[in-house]
């Protein structure tokens, strides 16, 4: 947990910017070592891979591959019409991606990591602001992927 400073800002040993896999690993390891940690992201927690990239892509490609495979096997005795019903496939994908942000936030809370939502803006060498809330830190980890 953070320690308040005389000016009202919170102080952490580490502030992590980004909330994807790399950010989570860094935050959890530092917290496990007994240090105070905060994590901030302007998007839902989970990162690109879990929410918008790798994982959902695999689910969508799985449906496309199944249709393609059946169609290519049609001359070899596999019969029947197959098609992707996009609303159902998207519901399937969302059944995996929608719970991710809440699970991440719950995990951070259980470990004593403070979670912030918003855009982190550096205000000094060891300080930043998130939607008007000031944080000070000893170390910062920018784990924001390509952004």
Name these PLM-found stretches.
Residues 18-21, 42-43:
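Glycine-rich Rossmann-fold phosphate-binding loop(s) that bind the pyrophosphate
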Residues 24:
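Residues forming the Rossmann-fold NAD(P)(H) cofactor-binding site
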């Amino acid at each position: 947990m953070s320690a308040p400073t005389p000016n009202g800002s919170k102080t952490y040993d580490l502030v992590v910017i980004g909330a994807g896999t790399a950010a989570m690993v860094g935050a959890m390891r530092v917290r496990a070592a007994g240090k105070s940690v905060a994590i901030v992201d302007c998007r839902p927690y989970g990162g690109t891979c879990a929410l918008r990239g790798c994982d959902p892509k695999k689910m969508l490609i799985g449906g496309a591959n199944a249709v393609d495979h059946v169609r290519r096997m049609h001359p070899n005795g596999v019969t029947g019409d197959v098609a992707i019903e996009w609303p159902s496939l998207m519901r399937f994908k969302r059944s995996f991606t929608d719970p991710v942000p809440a699970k991440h936030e719950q995990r951070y809370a259980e470990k004593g990591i403070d979670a912030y939502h918003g855009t982190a803006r550096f205000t000094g060498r060891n300080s930043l602001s998130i939607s008007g809330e000031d944080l000070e830190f000893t170390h910062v980890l920018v784990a924001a992927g390509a952004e």
